[in-house]
């Protein structure tokens, strides 16, 4: 038996994010579905006021986890152009696709051919025309420089060492003046022996050394352990 929705309202802080309230008092966040009737990762579809919303699962998306943990700044709105490094099978990119809408664009880089095929099936083949799929290695931005034009945001979520360096290298290529970067730090992918807080500090220092001002840092527990989201802006 499904629980009835009693209200859907815009998030008080974040453009394109909605808060769904259910009759049992629980709340979830969601985005307005750019491709109504279609799911990406088995998420719940919610109809309200003539629109359809996709529930945004914080256990499947680091950005959703950061928002629920109080992230104040998400530099993504309608029409934003984004370079997304580590697109995987498309969970978070699909919600960003909803937010940026038809006038936005997401250049989505994924290294694994198998996962890339899954990304294509779930997003591109399902009609998300604001997604540009790129099979490539985020460590070498020159390999896809001919595909990507200047972007407003570079977002990275990769399970590799030197995550901040990879982000900064891509920002040097593609980030417009005044643009933002969003770094998901996966501490265990960098150093399994060091405390996560030390790894976070190390990656943040790398961004500072590369000319970024750190605007906000949010830890992602309980949704993901030893993870943090960092928002920064190029000086």
UniProtKB/Swiss-Prot annotation:
Pfam families: Fibrillarin (PF01269). Keywords: Methyltransferase, RNA-binding, rRNA processing, Transferase, tRNA processing. It is an enzyme of class 2 (transferase). Signal peptide: none annotated. InterPro entries: Fibrillarin, Fibrillarin_CS, SAM-dependent_MTases_sf. Disulfide bonds: none annotated. The keyword Transferase applies. Belongs to the methyltransferase superfamily. Fibrillarin family. This is Fibrillarin-like rRNA/tRNA 2'-O-methyltransferase. It comes from Pyrobaculum aerophilum (strain ATCC 51768 / DSM 7523 / JCM 9630 / CIP 104966 / NBRC 100827 / IM2).
């Amino acid at each position: 038996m499904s629980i009835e929705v009693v209200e859907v309202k815009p998030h008080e802080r974040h453009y394109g994010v909605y808060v769904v309230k259910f009759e049992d008092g629980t709340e979830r966040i969601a985005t307005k579905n750019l491709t109504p009737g279609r799911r990406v990762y088995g998420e719940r579809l919610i109809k309200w006021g003539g629109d359809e919303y996709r529930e945004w699962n914080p256990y499947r998306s680091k950005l959703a986890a950061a928002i629920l943990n109080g992230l104040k700044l998400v530099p993504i709105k309608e029409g934003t152009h984004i370079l997304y490094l580590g697109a995987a099978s498309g969970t978070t990119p699909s919600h960003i696709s909803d937010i940026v809408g038809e006038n936005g664009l997401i250049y989505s880089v994924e290294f694994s051919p198998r996962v890339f095929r899954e990304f294509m099936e779930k997003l591109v083949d399902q009609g998300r025309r604001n997604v540009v799929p790129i099979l490539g290695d985020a460590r070498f931005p020159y390999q896809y420089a001919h595909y990507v034009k200047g972007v407003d945001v570079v977002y990275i979520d990769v399970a590799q060492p030197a995550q901040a360096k990879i982000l900064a290298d891509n920002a040097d290529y593609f980030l417009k003046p005044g643009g933002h970067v969003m770094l998901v730090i996966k501490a265990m992918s960098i150093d399994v022996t060091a405390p996560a807080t030390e790894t976070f500090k190390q990656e943040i220092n790398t961004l500072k050394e590369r000319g970024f001002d750190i605007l906000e840092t949010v830890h992602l527990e309980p949704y993901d352990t030893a993870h943090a989201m960092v928002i920064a802006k190029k000086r």
